[in-house]
Design a protein with these regions (language model features):
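N-terminal chloroplast transit peptides
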Residues: 1-25
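N-terminal amphipathic, basic helical "cap/leader" segment at the start of enzyme domains
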Residues: 2-6, 28-29, 36-151, 256-258
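C-terminal helix-cap and adjacent tail motif
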Residues: 52-60, 65-67, 226-258
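Small-aliphatic-rich amphipathic alpha-helix that forms the alpha element of a beta-alpha
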Residues: 83, 87-88, 159, 168-215
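Short, hinge-like loop/turn segments at secondary-structure boundaries
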Residues: 120-121, 221-223
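Acidic-glycine-rich active-site phosphate/pyrophosphate-binding loop
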Residues: 126, 155-170
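A generic local secondary-structure boundary/capping motif
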Residues: 141-144, 217-221
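Generic beta-strand structural signal
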Residues: 149-152, 198, 229
Length: 258
């Protein structure tokens, strides 16, 4: 399994810091006032420091798109499930709609997902929507590459949990679906970075809506859930590509600083 030295150094260093922070936060939370059955409040319950911030930044730096993935998992499936559960429990959503949904498929279920994708796109080849050349040289090799990985997280939005807020706050009715996508993106980034901090490589795909109906039927997903993206993860079998960044001056305005 390919693990670049810089990746290992950054991730190991960041995880060590975050582990210490987690233990510290757990001790603090046990003595805090309960404001909600699953929430605790204290101005000191998350003791931020420059070292903790540095650890978070290192996790962000280590997150990359890895496309050459394998079927070896560095952790137990229970550890992956724990990460997903924490994402759903603690990540924010606009107006606390909590409309993000995820379906995690690993092992044979993961293989089935990408078999479905291959079948659905194969139908587009038969109909002439995709050329044989594009299919054989681009689309099929990509889909087979995703199947070669260990698992996939499917990200959905549940409109049923958005509609009541659109009705209650009519002035923002057209904004709630957009804000839901924002919340979904937060979940995507957290789980992408989280999986890579566990030792996986990952890449984010968008093969909806071509696969939506067949996937919903196969995995018993409610038909009204809206598929947003697919996060493919597995053992790192090759390096990530070089990352190009546009100048910060073109992308940031920092005003009123002292």
């Amino acid at each position: 399994m390919y693990l670049p030295r810089l990746y290992l150094q950054r991730t190991s260093h960041a995880l060590s810091r975050l582990s210490r922070l987690s233990r510290s936060s757990s001790k603090l939370c046990t003595s805090q006032f309960v404001l909600h059955p699953t929430r605790y409040f204290s101005s000191s319950s998350f003791p931020m420091s420059s070292s903790n911030t540095d650890a978070l930044v290192e996790v962000a730096k280590a997150r990359r798109s890895y496309y050459k993935l394998g079927k070896t998992s560095p952790v137990s499936d229970a550890k992956v499930e724990e990460l997903v559960n924490n994402a759903i429990l603690y990540l924010p959503s606009s107006f606390n709609t909590q409309s993000t949904r995820v379906v995690v498929v690993v092992n044979d279920k993961h293989d089935k997902l990408w078999d479905i994708a291959i079948e659905q796109f194969g139908n587009l080849v038969k109909s002439g929507a995709i050329s044989e050349d594009q299919w054989n040289n681009q689309t099929l090799p990509k889909l087979q590459g995703f199947k070669a990985a260990y698992g996939t997280i499917l990200f959905y939005e549940d409109p049923a949990h958005i509609a009541p807020y659109s009705e209650k706050f009519a002035a923002f009715k057209d904004k709630f679906p957009i804000w839901a996508d924002h919340a979904n993106a937060i979940h995507q980034w957290f789980l992408w970075a989280g999986l890579e901090s566990l030792g996986f490589g990952a890449n984010l795909q968008h093969y909806n809506p071509v696969i939506d109906t067949a996937v919903a039927k196969e995995f018993d997903v409610p038909s009204d859930w809206r598929l947003i993206s697919q996060l493919v993860f597995g053992s790192i079998e090759g390096p990530a590509g070089e990352k190009q960044s546009k100048p910060l001056e073109e992308r940031i305005k920092f005003l009123g600083g002292k």
